[in-house]
Amino acid sequence: MRNLSILLFLIFSNLSAFAQDTLVLPIKPVVKDANYAGGNTEDLYYYVNNNFNYNNVKKEDIPKTAKKKPYFVFYVVFAVSEDGKAFEFSPKEISAENSFYKEAVRVIASTRWNVATKDNEYKKQFMVIPIKANIGDF
């Protein structure tokens, strides 16, 4: 009887040990970045370049550091809203009052974006777009 109870104890203790061997993996959130709805980055630059109206900019707004160069670069920072529109614009390396910046904001505001999501919920994401303004003809 003693041998039988020891044998049963060993069998049942091994079964409970097997039940504890479950693998628990941490859940990683699914994050999707915002992107231009009109295609890839090249398509975005093509759109900005073709829709940037140099009639809306002033020659005196060309930065002094770029006077003898054929172009200058500045950056437009913005967020993508829940409905895929660009908003909350801010300039980098240029004044917010500069006509080149204002024209770039006008063009970027006319674009549509696929929104950023985290676990299929809207996530506000900021984008930085470099703008190369060709000033060789001014």
Residue ranges of each PLM-predicted region?
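Hydrophobic helical h-region of N-terminal Sec-dependent signal peptides
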Residues: 2-10
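Charge-biased low-complexity segments
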Residues: 5-6, 17-138
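N-terminal signal peptide c-region/cleavage motif recognized by signal peptidases
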Residues: 12-16
